[in-house]
Amino acid sequence: MSRYRGPRVKIIRRLGALPGLTTKTLKSKSGYINQSTSNKKVSQYRIRLEEKQKLRFHYGLTERQLLKYVRIARKAKGSTGQVLLQLLEMRLDNILFRLGMALTVPGARQLVNHRHILINNSMVDIPSYNCKPKDVITIKDRPKSQSIITKNLNSFQKSKVPNHLSFDLMQVKGLVNQMIDREWILLKINELLVVEYYSRQV
């Protein structure tokens, strides 16, 4: 299954807020009833499916990519769900998003693909690059790179930077301090339901 490129509002209308996918939010209407779920019981399969879809759309993954991460998480020590979230949060495209260098994960992916980003002074053009503690993230010293990221930073609230990261606005430099803790995950998600969804596929 390919990466979703359709209307993003359609997705958040069905799944709720997905800050990694879009900055748009839906205003709730008083008295509004979701006709697709009213007057009928929602199956456990559908509940698990929607949690999985939240994860996939928020982090901008294909179905194959997400399944690969689930398999890696199952082989690692610790809670499969929490390891899965850590793997996704430490992707370079997501780190750029959490630092405010991009307003969405798709926007961050473009920055990486267009070679605007340096890790420890080396150019990295792989959005799925696994960032590690002590990694230093900077941008190429060229006007176009500076302009794009400065514009994004001006729209970002510095208070949103999670504890496992730090950002120097003057130097436009990010630092990975440590692996992310569960409490700093931005997406509202029940990762256990995602693991259960994939239980027969891994």
UniProtKB/Swiss-Prot annotation:
Transmembrane segments: none annotated. Residues 90-154 form the S4 RNA-binding domain. GO terms for molecular function: rRNA binding; structural constituent of ribosome. Keywords: Chloroplast, Plastid, Ribonucleoprotein, Ribosomal protein, RNA-binding, rRNA-binding. It holds the Pfam family S4. Its main location: plastid. It is found in: Plastid, Chloroplast. InterPro entries: Ribosomal_uS4, Ribosomal_uS4_bac-type, Ribosomal_uS4_CS, Ribosomal_uS4_N, S4_RNA-bd, S4_RNA-bd_sf. One of its GO terms (cellular component) is small ribosomal subunit. The keyword Chloroplast applies. One of its GO terms (biological process) is ribosomal small subunit biogenesis. One of the primary rRNA binding proteins, it binds directly to 16S rRNA where it nucleates assembly of the body of the 30S subunit. With S5 and S12 plays an important role in translational accuracy. Belongs to the universal ribosomal protein uS4 family. Part of the 30S ribosomal subunit. Contacts protein S5. The interaction surface between S4 and S5 is involved in control of translational fidelity. This is Small ribosomal subunit protein uS4c. It comes from Monoclea forsteri. The lineage of its organism: Eukaryota, Viridiplantae, Streptophyta, Embryophyta, Marchantiophyta. The gene is rps4.
